[in-house]
């Protein structure tokens, strides 16, 4: 059976057993901030197992894409060198949420594996482990399923603590836990290794193919296990492992799926496909990289983006080792999409995006890869011992972009190790250097803890009656706030929108009789809305009734900008591609700021397209509609949810232009798209690797921006004695005239330099048979000095030259050495000394170098270094 057939058979089998087929979740966990990547099938069902989430089904089956690279679960260093380690793998799993338990889970697994209708594995090849004290599971296996006792193994607490066992699963120190039973396949006596639980269990003969976890206890802090009222089942079977069994091969890299990727990798690199570890690395890494990029991760220097960058660069290094010339990795994406695109359509829909991202990253790394490898070779040649020092590893990381594990990979091939502790010390020192020395004041608002909740009325009103239920000053609860005091007011009900989803909190005021509180910001903690501000008059007391009034004009302007971000988001996806995801936003009354995932700067025509699309929707003047529904229904309607956001049982779906833009959002918005009036992008740029930022204005602010631009056009026209109609022609004429004058100036400077050269050559002194000339020519730029040094080298014939100039308040230096002397004296070395003397830097070739500095007063001192430099080197 092919891998795709095994996947489909598994899903179909459990559907026939009453399970709901659930699509794989993203590799970016959206409900677990502790998890770097999705690494197991149960991740998306975690809240179901904890009882925090109820779904319409109690039985589920899935084929989950998983990544283990970085963080606690990290297989990266072993990938390519073993038969079964991968950065990406598929986990087939069936799950029960308080439905069936051990008997059915065991029966399902055995039936699927051994039945002639399904996988038809020979029963005598299968071994089973259970937790040492799990007699229930043992009896089901031996008495009901019929597994002989000689192929049953009880595994106890083999990890040094109670319930610390390969066959006892825990979610943490406390919480749901329980025993598990694992099924192993015996590859036969030709392969070394012993059965599970034996001293030789780490061999490759007996391979685990399926794990059934029985969540039947809740462990409390005292270590006591309490039975759960509704036990559950979580299982996992690696698709690659079971494919190897069914295709009668020992290594996962020999299965059909990998054979196709290995062939594509060999073709892209231009090497033979004969089982090299490096080729396996490339074939494995294209899967993790392709899927991560499809799920919204982009290469960067932190978090998930850095893990992706590490994997890409490891693949590039192994391709380089195999002889790859130029970019090759991105060329394998087509084979990946062909192999796995039917099961995971995102690979096909985002193929072009994945290729662009990989190619850009490859090209960036290629600039330093060769140089970094040469530096490493030099350091290894001088190495005494078998440990690469931490400072060398750090230099490669900091200067040449080599992740630590890439250097470790190279060291491993030479039977060397790296000094990880030394590398971390260098990293800590760098962080300390970068850490700001600024002292920050206490954020008292972070101390505010409120048990009460506030009823929000702001979707329908900007004014409301309420009552003060809590007051805070400097983070501490108080009974009243007096005139002039700053603090926080909590009401039982409010029309003020609290900062969320990028939209700033509302401003306005609270009136309590003669007392007035100016609200400068509104935030939220738990269910309570915090009104931050100052008492303008009178005093506020807990229990007092208040009239809450939002600054409606400011809120309205903010709402227009918020609605515009939704239109912009969809426009970006249409113009740039579906890989675009929101990475952050800030919406206030003045402008909007929208951060999104993209790998390159936008072209002017793309920015114009975005403006045209958004303004087209604005002119349609369609109603902005909202609907409250459950998350699954919202997603079925195509509503975009933000990665990393946690959504409750009920979500608010906001639609614009019919189905043009459909997003989950709790913010304040325009009533109709026409209220936005006008949308204008005012800037676009990068804020991080793979993240771009657009700033834009709407409504009156957009009109003001265009009016200001019109005034600038008028002023420019007046400066060149033209008008709006002929401004471009006038400016072109001015620029052309300027180019002509610059050319004439260069010619005059060249003549002056030539004349100066004749005079300067007479000022050279002789040092050990060579002419040495150091001279100061203030007012000359670097270009003029370079030309003059070339001229002087020709005139003097056997010479060392150092020229300096004060130009626009800074020092400019140029050094030259005639070729017959450049093996003894290097211009770059002279420049380093001279530039350092004027507080700057410099360098260059052995025969010509440039530099500069900021200490004009030290220029003469720097020039005086030329003679002793020549004396020492000749």
From Swiss-Prot:
Q: Can you name one GO molecular function term for this protein?
A: aminoacyl-tRNA deacylase activity
Q: Which Gene3D superfamilies match?
A: 2.40.30.130, 3.10.310.40, 3.30.54.20, 6.10.250.550, Bira Bifunctional Protein, Domain 2, Threonyl-trna Synthetase, Chain A, domain 2
- What EC number is given for this enzyme? 6.1.1.7
- Say which enzyme class the record assigns: ligase
Q: Which UniProt keywords apply?
A: Aminoacyl-tRNA synthetase, ATP-binding, Cytoplasm, Ligase, Metal-binding, Nucleotide-binding, Protein biosynthesis, RNA-binding, tRNA-binding, Zinc
Biological process (GO) annotations?
A: alanyl-tRNA aminoacylation; negative regulation of DNA-templated transcription
What remark about domains does the record contain? Answer: Consists of three domains; the N-terminal catalytic domain, the editing domain and the C-terminal C-Ala domain. The editing domain removes incorrectly charged amino acids, while the C-Ala domain, along with tRNA(Ala), serves as a bridge to cooperatively bring together the editing and aminoacylation centers thus stimulating deacylation of misacylated tRNAs.
This chain's protein is named: Alanine--tRNA ligase
The organism that produces this protein has a lineage beginning with: Bacteria, Pseudomonadati, Pseudomonadota, Gammaproteobacteria, Pseudomonadales
């Amino acid at each position: 059976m092919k891998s795709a057939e095994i996947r489909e058979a598994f899903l179909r089998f459990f559907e026939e057993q009453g399970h709901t087929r659930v699509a794989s979740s993203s590799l970016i966990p959206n409900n677990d901030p502790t998890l770097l990547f999705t690494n197991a099938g149960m991740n998306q069902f975690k809240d179901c197992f904890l009882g925090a989430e109820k779904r319409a089904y109690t039985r589920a089956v899935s084929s989950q894409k998983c990544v283990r690279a970085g963080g606690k679960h990290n297989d990266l260093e072993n990938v390519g060198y073993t038969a079964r380690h991968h950065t990406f793998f598929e986990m087939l799993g069936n799950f029960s949420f308080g439905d069936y338990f051990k008997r059915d889970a065991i029966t399902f697994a055995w039936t699927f594996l051994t039945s002639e209708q399904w996988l038809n594995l020979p029963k005598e090849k299968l071994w089973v482990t259970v937790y040492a004290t799990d007699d229930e599971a043992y009896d089901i296996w031996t008495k009901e399923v019929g597994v002989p006792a000689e192929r049953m193994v009880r595994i106890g607490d083999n990890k040094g603590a109670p319930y610390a066992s390969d066959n006892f699963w825990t979610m943490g120190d406390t919480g749901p836990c329980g025993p598990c039973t694992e099924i192993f396949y015996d590859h036969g006596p030709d392969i070394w290794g012993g059965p599970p639980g034996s001293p030789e269990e780490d061999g490759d003969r007996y391979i685990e193919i399926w794990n059934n976890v029985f969540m039947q206890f809740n462990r409390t802090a005292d270590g006591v296990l309490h039975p759960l009222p509704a036990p559950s089942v979580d299982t996992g079977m690696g698709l690659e492992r079971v494919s190897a069994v069914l295709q009668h091969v020992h290594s996962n890299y020999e299965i059909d799926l990998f054979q196709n990727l290995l062939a594509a990798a060999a073709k892209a690199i231009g090497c033979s496909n004969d089982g090299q570890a490096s080729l396996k690395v490339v074939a494995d890494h294209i899967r993790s990289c392709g899927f991560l990029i499809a799920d919204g991760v982009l290469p960067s220097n932190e978090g998930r983006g850095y893990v992706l960058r590490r994997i890409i660069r490891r693949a590039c290094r192994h391709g380089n080792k195999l002889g790859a010339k130029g970019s090759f990795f991105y060329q394998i994406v087509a084979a990946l999409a062909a192999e796995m695109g039917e099961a995971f359509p995102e690979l096909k829909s985002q193929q072009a995006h994945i290729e662009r991202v990989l190619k850009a990253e490859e090209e960036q790394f290629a600039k330093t890869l060769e140089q970094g490898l040469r530096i490493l070779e030099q350091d290894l040649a001088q190495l005494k011992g078998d440990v690469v020092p931490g400072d060398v590893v750090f230099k490669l990381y900091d200067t040449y972009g080599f992740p630590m594990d890439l250097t470790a990979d190279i060291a491993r091939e030479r039977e060397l190790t790296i000094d990880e502790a030394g590398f971390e010390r260098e990293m800590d020192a760098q962080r300390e250097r970068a850490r700001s020395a600024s002292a920050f004041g206490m954020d008292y608002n972070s101390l505010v803890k409120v048990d009460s909740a506030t009823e929000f009325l702001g979707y329908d009103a900007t004014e409301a009656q309420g009552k003060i239920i809590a007051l805070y000053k400097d983070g501490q609860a108080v009974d009243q706030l007096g005139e002039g005091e700053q603090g926080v007011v909590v009401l039982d009900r409010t029309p003020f929108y609290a900062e969320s989803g990028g939209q700033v909190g509302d401003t306005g005021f609270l009136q309590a009789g003669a007392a007035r509180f100016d609200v400068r910001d509104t935030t939220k903690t738990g269910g309570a809305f915090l009104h931050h501000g100052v008492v303008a008059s009178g005093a506020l007391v807990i229990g007092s009734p208040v009239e809450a009034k939002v600054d409606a004009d400011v809120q309205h302007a903010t709402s227009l900008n918020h609605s515009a971000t939704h239109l912009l988001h969809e426009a970006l996806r249409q113009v740039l591609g579906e890989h675009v995801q929101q990475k952050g936003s800030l919406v206030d009354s003045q402008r909007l700021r929208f951060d999104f995932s993209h790998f390159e700067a936008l072209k002017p025509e793309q920015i114009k397209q975005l403006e045209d699309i958004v303004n087209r929707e604005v002119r349609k003047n369609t109603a902005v509609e909202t609907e409250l529904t459950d998350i699954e229904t919202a997603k079925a309607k195509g509503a975009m949810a933000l990665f990393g956001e946690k959504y409750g049982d009920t979500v608010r779906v906001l639609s614009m232009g019919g189905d043009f833009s459909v997003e989950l959002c709790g913010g304040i918005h325009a009533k109709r798209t026409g209220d936005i009036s006008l949308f204008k992008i005012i800037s676009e740029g990068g804020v991080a690797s793979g993240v771009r930022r657009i700033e834009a204005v709407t409504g009156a602010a957009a009109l003001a921006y265009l009016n200001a631009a019109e005034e600038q056009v008028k002023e420019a026209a007046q400066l060149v004695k033209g008008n709006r109609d002929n401004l471009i022609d006038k400016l072109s004429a001015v620029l052309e005239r300027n180019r002509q004058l610059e050319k004439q100036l260069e010619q005059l400077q060249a003549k002056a330099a030539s004349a100066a050269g004749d005079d300067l050559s007479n000022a050279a002194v002789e040092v050990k048979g060579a002419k040495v000339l150091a001279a100061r020519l203030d007012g000359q730029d670097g270009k003029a000095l370079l030309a003059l040094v070339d001229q002087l080298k020709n005139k003097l014939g056997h010479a060392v030259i150092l020229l300096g100039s004060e130009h626009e308040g800074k020092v400019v230096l140029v050094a030259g050495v005639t070729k017959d002397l450049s093996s003894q004296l290097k211009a770059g070395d002279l420049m380093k000394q001279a530039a350092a003397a004027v507080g700057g830097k410099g360098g260059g070739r052995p025969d010509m170098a440039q530099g500069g500095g900021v200490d004009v007063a030290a220029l003469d001192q720097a020039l005086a270094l030329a003679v002793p430099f020549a004396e020492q080197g000749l």
